[in-house]
């Protein structure tokens, strides 16, 4: 029987101080300003998802959706540590996203290291609350996955799953954008919001009035991005279910006698060697 793990889907929204270029983690003016967190059990329907938005500013709940819990922070470092606090609070078994090994996790690591200077607190992502996760670099390549190189935090007790390389391995598509993949497999997509639109919403959404509060225009702007960010994470969790990712990974791990994370971080040879070693052990 396959267990029903608790799954957390997350997504970042990042601001670029130069609207004509992609956000850069080393650029001081760029920052993470929203993190959507969608929590569910394996085989849950969307109505049972717990939706949370961690954010700078003050998004309008009428825009993001009344079913979304909004947690507001004053600074980027508070937001990043708030993400760790959320993980410790909800204690998911699996943390999933789309291209999280290629962007989200390396970006979080870089920002937490500098300029936020909160890496030690941020890295406490494992089951043991006061234990810092080890920073590791994965480098390998295969015909199925291509060249893989990324940084990640080895958080004890948590399984990180990036759907992008799994989809690329199993399906031949013209494009692998989340919009294209979600439209094809689940018939859903997210609101049309360009990168420049996101940056503009941040500029508007972080402006305070003279009394220090946020006006309706600012709240609406941050709410628009917040809704978009939440949609991203909901879609990823639905894809995780639709593609039967958990069942596929657990069954393959059983057959190959390897940990699940090894399936997409160490190539094909480890699967063969592990079975050979098991046979040798049985034969003495």
Spell out what each predicted region is.
Residues 1-18, 127-146, 151-153, 277-278, ...:
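Extended, Lys/Arg-enriched charged tracts that mediate electrostatic binding to polyanionic substrates
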Residues 1-94, 115:
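Conserved RNase H-like, two-metal-ion catalytic cores of nucleic-acid enzymes
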Residues 12-16, 39-41, 101, 165-167, ...:
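Short, flexible loop/turn elements at secondary-structure junctions
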Residues 23-29, 104-118, 126, 253-255, ...:
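Short secondary-structure boundary/capping segments
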Residues 47-54, 61-70, 74, 91, ...:
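Active-site-proximal helix-loop-helix substrate-binding element of RNase H-like nuclease domains
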Residues 92-100, 252-253:
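Short glycine-rich phosphate-binding loop at a beta-alpha junction
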Residues 199-284:
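Common nucleic-acid-contacting/processivity interface regions adjacent to the catalytic cores
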């Amino acid at each position: 029987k396959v267990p029903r793990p608790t799954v957390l889907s997350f997504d970042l929204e990042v601001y670029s101080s130069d609207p004509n270029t992609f956000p850069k983690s080393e650029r001081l003016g760029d920052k993470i300003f929203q993190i959507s967190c969608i929590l569910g059990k394996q085989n849950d329907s969307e109505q049972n998802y717990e939706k949370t938005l961690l954010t700078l500013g003050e998004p309008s709940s009428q825009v993001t959706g009344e079913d979304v819990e909004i947690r507001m922070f004053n600074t980027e470092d508070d937001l990043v540590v708030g993400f760790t606090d959320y993980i410790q609070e909800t204690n998911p078994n699996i943390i999933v996203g789309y291209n999280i090994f290629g962007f989200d996790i390396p970006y979080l690591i870089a920002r937490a290291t500098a300029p936020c200077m909160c890496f030690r607190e941020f890295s406490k992502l494992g089951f043991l609350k006061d234990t810092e996760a080890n920073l590791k670099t994965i480098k390998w390549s295969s015909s199925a996955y291509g060249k893989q190189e990324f940084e990640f935090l080895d958080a004890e007790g948590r399984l990180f799953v990036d759907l992008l390389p799994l989809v690329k391995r199993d399906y031949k598509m013209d494009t692998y954008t989340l919009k294209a993949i979600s439209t094809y497999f689940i018939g859903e997509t997210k609101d049309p919001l360009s990168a420049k639109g996101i940056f503009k919403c941040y500029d508007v959404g972080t402006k305070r009035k003279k009394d220090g509060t946020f006006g309706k225009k600012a709240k609406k702007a941050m709410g628009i991005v917040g809704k978009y960010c939440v949609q991203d994470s909901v879609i990823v969790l639905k894809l995780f279910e639709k593609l039967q990712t958990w069942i596929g990974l657990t069954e393959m791990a059983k057959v190959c006698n390897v940990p699940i994370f090894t399936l997409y971080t160490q190539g094909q040879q480890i699967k063969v060697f592990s079975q050979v070693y098991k046979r040798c052990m049985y034969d003495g």
